Amino acid sequence: MNKEEMNARQKKIRNFSIIAHIDHGKSTLADRILEQTGALTHREMKNQLLDSMDLERERGITIKLNAVQLKYKAKDGETYIFHLIDTPGHVDFTYEVSRSLAACEGAILVVDAAQGIEAQTLANVYLALDNDLEILPVINKIDLPAADPERVRAEIEDVIGLDASDAVLASAKSGIGIEDILEQIVEKVPEPSGDVNKPLKALIFDSVFDAYRGVIANIRIMDGVVKAGDRIKMMSNGKEFEVTEVGVFSPKATPRDELLVGDVGYLTAAIKNVGDTRVGDTITLANNPAEEALDGYRKLNPMVYCGLYPIDSSKYNDLRDALEKLELNDSALQFEAETSQALGFGFRCGFLGLLHMEIIQERIEREFNIDLITTAPSVIYHVNLTDGSNIVVDNPADMPEPGVIESVEEPYVKATVMVPNDYVGAVMELAQNKRGNFITMEYLDDIRVSIVYEIPLSEIVYDFFDQLKSSTKGYASFDYELIGYKASKLVKMDILLNAEKVDALSFIVHRDFAYERGKIIVEKLKELIPRQQFEVPIQAAIATKIVSRSTIKALRKNVLAKCYGGDVSRKRKLLEKQKEGKKRMKQIGSVEVPQEAFMAILKMDESK
């Protein structure tokens, strides 16, 4: 292909993604676009085609990214090359979204005609604006009885500040308006900039592990060209590999001779570890490298930690294998072995957020058939000690004694809640209970309000989302971003059973709520732990101070049953003997803690 042909081809390329809140019809719209452009026959079509994981289909969410090349013959008679890059919509995967948006020049903003703009839509729109994308608003589900496209059009203009006068009215389900969307992509999305003669610069926006071919990196060529046989270099870590294959997804992987500037496709190079192809990194040629990497790359750090333990301890090695396999596809997952006196051998795992944690747990239970016990999630605390040093604590059991702690800092997030104005009071009350600081509130229109609070992340990881949904009858949408660390009066609370600490039940709590939480958890554990042959005291303690106590009464046999009448001293002797036996049992007896007891910590606030 000569230079003019390359330039002409580049002018015909359109790279775009679809951004939407969960359930606003993103994956359905992607399906319709695939069908309309003839990428698939009707027979091959199945719903949510780009969501390849069972879990994605069931929950109706997109977790891993997918990119497809499509050919579209426009009304002007020319054939255009479309690259549709699917993005996850959930807050936990914000970094993946930002990188996949960086691979595009345009974004289709899908808004539900009945529900209007939601918090996560807004978060993703701001990411798109940060990447200077051309945004095309689409009002979807116009065939719903509750649809009100004009209200939503006004909302897009007022809340986001986008001109929505020519927003396409569509119904992805019944195929209305799909052609208008495709024509708008041709007209409004800019062609890719970039120079085929410059040294190679390719952005990695996703990577998956294949057992036979190693890592398959999804890339967008920003400058230059790449083909099989090239020796490439990763700019973040300097590692070099030889390319074995390049190609595009259409939607199945189709090998090509080369990928040119503007193309979105995949590359394999016998890379053994997904950690070597980090999302956001830049690939260049080893013998003719680019001078500087594309900006925006950062290493993902987990925000939430929890312990995963196999219920059957013989499956410990299977759990290690399962985590290693999941880590191949998920560079944000981190884990290390840990032991607990109560739960045996297991792993301390780090996740991007709560949804990420739930998905990993479900995948281990489903795909690898391992039943898990999970400990309460915790966040990363920065602890300043009296000797002037600092430590990082992600497991409550590792928190030092109060005497050596100068101060403890915890992560805060900026939480944006969008809610109908009838529920403003309920949301504000919930945020206050979670130690939130009110920042702003604005009315989006006459029925919906956006409320912004600063809240400690530790308060959100428990059950904030569940409580928000129940207090607003499911109408609220919620989004959060980390803003930094602040000092708080935090203490570690230990739970003692039969005067022994149960390390897996320890948690970190704000001093003002310590007494109340200690009381709730002690009462819950009393209900959940079965009665033993001896009496079991349950105590909640901060350092050496007991803040709450309850006792599980012993099961006892009636030793007097065989004494009919008779001397009182005989009865007393039998009772004393029983008492001695119980005392001995109590010294050597251990208490079985059921799985529900660990979950009780998570659901602590429900009984308030």
UniProtKB/Swiss-Prot annotation:
Q: Does the keyword Hydrolase apply?
A: yes
Reactions mediated catalytically: GTP + H2O = GDP + phosphate + H(+)
Q: Which residues bind GTP?
A: D23, H24, G25, K26, S27, T28, N140, K141, I142, D143
**Which superkingdom, per the lineage?**
Bacteria
Instruction: Name the Enzyme Commission number(s) assigned to this protein.
Output: 3.6.5.n1
Q: Does the keyword Cell membrane apply?
A: yes
> Which InterPro entries does the record associate with it?
EF-4, EFG_III/V, EFG_V-like, EFTu-like_2, G_TR_CS, LepA_C_sf, LepA_CTD, LepA_IV
Q: Which GO terms describe its biological process?
A: positive regulation of translation
The family database entries (Pfam families) matched by this protein are listed as:
EFG_C (PF00679), GTP_EFTU (PF00009), GTP_EFTU_D2 (PF03144), LepA_C (PF06421)
Q: Where in the cell is it found?
A: Cell membrane
The annotated topology with respect to the bilayer is:
Peripheral membrane protein
| A GO molecular-function descriptor | GTPase activity
> What keywords does the record list, in alphabetical order?
Cell membrane, GTP-binding, Hydrolase, Membrane, Nucleotide-binding, Protein biosynthesis
Which family is this protein grouped under?
Answer: Belongs to the TRAFAC class translation factor GTPase superfamily. Classic translation factor GTPase family. LepA subfamily.
The identity of this protein, by name, is: Elongation factor 4
Q: Which organism is it from?
A: Listeria welshimeri serovar 6b (strain ATCC 35897 / DSM 20650 / CCUG 15529 / CIP 8149 / NCTC 11857 / SLCC 5334 / V8)
What does the organism's lineage look like at the top? Answer: Bacteria, Bacillati, Bacillota, Bacilli, Bacillales
Give the gene that encodes this protein.
lepA
